[in-house]
Amino acid sequence: MRKLVIIPTYNEKENISAMIDKVFSLPEPFELLVIDDGSPDGTAEIVRQRRKEFPETLHLLERSGKQGLGTAYLTGFRWGLDNGFDYICEMDCDFSHNPDDLVRLYEAAAEGNDVVVGSRYVQGVNVVNWPMSRLLMSYFASMYVRIVTRMPLRDATAGFVCYSRHALETLDLDAVRMKGCLLYTSDAA
């Protein structure tokens, strides 16, 4: 089974190399697709250099200008499907998601779950590098989504998700709109 991790970046030169090392040190083999939105800090150049070490498993898509997280994920989903991946995961580069948990996300998806959402709030709060205001906004937004949708999601704004190929092929990605971590579909006729 081929597994891809999509990591959108913008000014992540302080984190990208450590993230690459961490993902490629996991006991499960993952390929990594970095989608950089024209980072002025040189993030893409670091990835280009690191591709010399991982030419078959580290991929880079460079986009001009800051086009946004949602469109980066959609671009990554299309790229992953076009390149034959069976599972496609998404995560942030700033280590607010623990890369070690990629293995657990994949294993849960491989058990027959089409979408597996990682949570920072299952056992207390597991978030680093966030100001309290952002943490509270995320926590209460997730609580709101859980109440309104009656879905047992602990972290609706996680952005740490593993999708099966089947789940993504079921969506019309051209009709999907994403704003940050929120995914919208359209049935416009």
Go through each PLM region and give its residues.
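Acceptor/aglycone-binding surface of glycosyltransferases and processive sugar-polymer synthases
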Residues: 61-82, 87, 99-178
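Cell-envelope/extracellular polymer assembly enzymes that use nucleotide-activated donors
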Residues: 2-4, 31
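Donor nucleotide-sugar binding loop of glycosyltransferases
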Residues: 12-15, 39, 98
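Short, well-formed alpha-helical segments that are part of the catalytic scaffolds
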Residues: 12-25
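Conserved small/polar residues in nucleotide/adenosyl-binding loops
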Residues: 184-189
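A conserved acidic beta->alpha catalytic loop
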Residues: 36-45, 95
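Acidic helix N-cap motif at the loop->helix transition within catalytic regions
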Residues: 17-18, 41-50
